[in-house]
Amino acid sequence: AETTAPSVYPLAPGTALKSNSMVTLGCLVKGYFPEPVTVTWNSGALSSGVHTFPAVLQSGLYTLTSSVTVPSSTWPSQTVTCNVAHPASSTKVDKKIVPRNCGGDCKPCICTGSEVSSVFIFPPKPKDVLTITLTPKVTCVVVDISQDDPEVHFSWFVDDVEVHTAQTRPPEEQFNSTFRSVSELPILHQDWLNGRTFRCKVTSAAFPSPIEKTISKPEGRTQVPHVYTMSPTKEEMTQNEVSITCMVKGFYPPDIYVEWQMNGQPQENYKNTPPTMDTDGSYFLYSKLNVKKEKWQQGNTFTCSVLHEGLHNHHTEKSLSHSPGK
């Protein structure tokens, strides 16, 4: 094989660094023949924290990496350079390590998982979809955005047709010095219920390529929920606070909204279990309202209100109250 000089790439972290931390910088020495190469840092002035890994032979050429770990107070405020020598080709290369982002035309760089942005898409809230006076929204969230490149651009598509009605908030800085960006697309109730597909496309200078996420209503035959209410048990009546329970079963899809009223007034002191798949593939959940025992004993009317697309007008409710003598 003929003598081949190496290509040298500086390796830098993908995001800005916290103060009082250590930072690992690297040099990738790629595609040379024959061995050896030597790698020093700042012409040998940096020697502690250096790791030069054994060369790997691939397709007749060698590649190796060398790294150095320095305090973030040292870099990038002070210059760090890797010095590569390949005697066989009389090559000497000095590469200064400069801060850079992962992505775009960036050469290989050291990126840990926590420094790579993630994109998530969320469905509209069932209450918004099933209430004609509310506006359902599909939400796209980007997290772990580098403060070097906090700007991201959202594009939205409904069944592959681009729409321009989304509301995008400015990036918000998080406690870990990364940014978070949120875009919300208001949608038509029937577009979601009819199973149209919503796609969020996110582009950024920090991404090698756009990231896309898609969401739509779960497929399957709609099944109507059955609603049952249960009074507090006799054993529980020894307590100061009692539980009124609503069981909702046999519904599909799992998107559902359950809330409580007392004498027509909304109540807050309740908890719902997540919709859980039953043995027949439909879903069920329990909702538990906690009330003061005297409120129950006074004969107040408690109503479990359910919103689901399988119901007439998307709504049903079941009420119960204490009957003296029970």
UniProtKB/Swiss-Prot annotation:
GO terms for molecular function: antigen binding; immunoglobulin receptor binding. Residues 113-219 are annotated as: CH2. GO terms for cellular component: immunoglobulin complex, circulating. It comes from the Eukaryota. The keyword Transport does not apply. InterPro entries: Ig-like_dom, Ig-like_dom_sf, Ig-like_fold, Ig_C1-set, Immune_Resp_Modulators. GO terms for biological process: antibacterial humoral response; complement activation, classical pathway. Residues 98-112 are annotated as: Hinge. Coiled coil: none annotated. Residues 220-326 are annotated as: CH3. SMART domains: IGc1. Glycans are attached at N176. Residues 1-97 are annotated as: CH1. Disulfide bonds join C27-C82, C140-C200, C246-C304. PROSITE patterns: IG_LIKE (PS50835). Keywords: Disulfide bond, Glycoprotein, Immunoglobulin domain. This is Ig gamma-1 chain C region. It comes from Rattus norvegicus.
